[in-house]
UniProtKB/Swiss-Prot annotation:
InterPro entries: Homing_endonucl, Sporu_reg_WhiA_N_dom, Sporulation_regulator_WhiA, Sporulation_regulator_WhiA_C, WhiA_LAGLIDADG_dom. Keywords: Cell cycle, Cell division, DNA-binding. Residues 275-308 bind DNA. GO terms for molecular function: DNA binding. This is Probable cell division protein WhiA. It comes from Nocardioides sp. (strain ATCC BAA-499 / JS614). The gene is whiA. Belongs to the WhiA family. Involved in cell division and chromosome segregation.
């Protein structure tokens, strides 16, 4: 099963009991998957999904939380859209639902971002809003160089609102316009894992992390297999040795590590085979090879000085004979 489909299937079956969370999820699903239409002078609420489970979840929540009936219509795929689409439509009480969910403000005007009750709600409401947005128009690509969790948004206001909701959860997301389409994107692997955990997609997270780990191991093996140059092998060994020293430095300093040095050290630990130039490219903002090397040197020097003061083994104590061996 593709990652997006797996996540949506799991989220659609997640049990949510708090009314405030169910309201936030409904509002988000309607905002990101739907719209308001005027039919014969009446406001009709519609939302379109690519899974029947998401459509049925929305219909159930609308009925149980707001007491309104809705219809679910399946539209078969055609040449442009291969998969079937599921449309949830509220005709009779469309205007009432639009006002109750905050899609219309007190003056009857459409809300372009997310409803104020969702934006200013609690942490559980923020989680529910993201769950609804992902069920509506989310995608998760396979782990790799371009892996990302994305949500396609109805407009820039909704995108910025979703970024703000992510920030409340401690997750860094970016709003981007690509070929006229507004998207919210999360690229950092750890942030993706954190969000999937908060949303309740635990099985999907395990599958994604397993594929991510498998890819990293395969990439490392491929790089080592292609090392037909002794200098490259020495560079790889030096990178691994630096990683071991950084790990010991973090252990020695604990909470005393300055943030900018901690970030450089974390990059070295997370990408043990990467060159200094590659580490600089991974840093946010991007750093030169010399800048990232300087930060790692300062981290090691700071840790060695602290180790000497405490009378404990320094960072070089973490090196093994294999790391120090020369090419034969």
């Amino acid at each position: 099963m593709a990652m997006t489909a797996q996540v949506k299937a799991e989220l659609a079956s997640t049990q949510v009991t708090k009314t405030c969370c169910r309201k936030a999820e409904v509002a988000s699903m309607l905002r990101f998957a739907g719209g308001l239409h005027i039919v014969s002078g009446r406001i009709v609420v519609e939302a379109e999904f690519d899974t029947g489970a998401a459509a049925r979840r929305l219909r159930t929540n609308i009925a149980e939380v707001y007491g309104h009936q809705s219809d679910v219509v399946m539209v078969q795929g055609n040449g442009i859209r291969k998969g079937s689409r599921y449309i949830v439509r509220v005709v009779k009480d469309g205007e009432a639902l639009a006002r109750q969910t905050g899609l219309l403000d007190q003056r009857g005007r459409p809300v372009r971002g997310l409803p104020p009750a969702v934006v200013s709600g609690g942490g559980c409401d923020a989680v529910a809003a993201w769950r609804g947005a992902f069920l509506a128009h989310g995608s998760l690509t396979e782990p790799g160089r371009s892996s990302a969790l994305e949500v396609t948004c109805p407009g820039p206001e909704a995108a910025l609102a979703l970024v703000g909701v992510a920030r409340r959860l401690g997750i860094h997301a970016k709003a981007r316009e690509v070929r006229g389409v507004d998207r919210v994107v999360i690229r950092d692997g750890d942030a993706i894992g954190q969000l999937l955990t908060r949303l309740g997609a635990h099985e999907s997270l395990m599958a994604w992390e397993e594929r991510r780990m498998r890819r990293e191991v395969r990439a490392t093996a491929n790089r080592l297999a292609n090392f037909d140059d002794a200098n490259l092998r020495r560079s790889a060994r030096a990178a691994v040795a630096a990683g071991a020293r950084v790990d010991r430095a973090m252990e020695i300093l604990g909470e005393e590590v300055p943030d900018h040095l901690r970030m450089a050290g974390q990059l070295r630990l997370e990408h043990k085979q990467a060159s200094l130039e590659e580490l600089g490219q991974l840093h946010d903002p991007v750093l030169t090879k010399d800048a990232i090397a300087g930060r790692i040197r300062r981290l090691l020097a700071m840790a060695d000085k602290r180790a000497e003061e405490l009378g404990i083994p320094d960072t070089e104590s973490s090196l093994t004979p294999d790391m120090l061996a020369d090419e034969g």
